[in-house]
Amino acid sequence: MHEAQIRVAIAGAGGRMGRQLIQAAMAMEGVQLGAALEREGSSLLGSDAGELAGAGKSGVIVQSSLEAVKDDFDVFIDFTRPEGTLTHLAFCRQHGKGMVIGTTGFDDAGKQAIREASQEIAIVFAANFSVGVNVMLKLLEKAAKVMGDYSDIEIIEAHHRHKVDAPSGTALAMGEAIAGALDKDLKDCAVYSREGYTGERVPGTIGFATVRAGDIVGEHTAMFADIGERVEITHKASSRMTFANGALRSALWLKTKKNGLFDMRDVLGLDVL
């Protein structure tokens, strides 16, 4: 293998995101698809990962055992569900493998497990791996510092009918970026649902609204509304390949890291702007 390459393993190989990640790994220079995983009992076990993803023969067979492929990858990429990701995290921590985590919906204990593991292995953990979304998060911080103290802030997100968590991880990251810029904790100012007689809007809160419909890949808007004007900052994704390419870019970036917890803004160098 060329010195510049990094070998990746893809979790959830048969899922929508897993297939995109396989395609991206096979296409991206400097990346080698080393392993592809599916759950025990899946009808996809034994398939060629590249053919499964519609990218042509890869020579990588879909398996269910991480132990069987532990010598075939350097970085594990996981966009599955929290319980599965935490199992994979424990394995990677034990075997010194880097991780790129795009799974959302973790509770506080899950997030703490990721923080603890990052003391021993390098992890990029992000709610969204799109370059555009991460630029948007930086813009939200700037807007919040100028307008946040006097405007009503609302975050609206829309995703496909199959998404199982709400609000989306990206919407929560948007809220955290805004709250952080205002020296607040999102837990203290978030309003996640409104129904019935709610009374007037409480000043200083950050509202969230969620749409689940059709095949929407991902749309996010933050609204800063005052009397007579409002500013809206929006990102719309039209292809999951945007997220897949960002995840592979993160895996390449991790090549020089031994441990630590990072996000996509670190990968892109946005914190220096």
Curated annotation (Swiss-Prot):
Xref: InterPro entries: DapB_C, DapB_N, DapB_N_CS, DHDPR_bac, NAD(P)-bd_dom_sf
One function term, GO molecular function aspect: NADP binding
CDD domains: DHDPR_N
Claim: NAD is one of the keywords in the record: yes
Top-level enzyme category: oxidoreductase
Record EC number: 1.17.1.8
Name by which UniProt lists this protein: 4-hydroxy-tetrahydrodipicolinate reductase
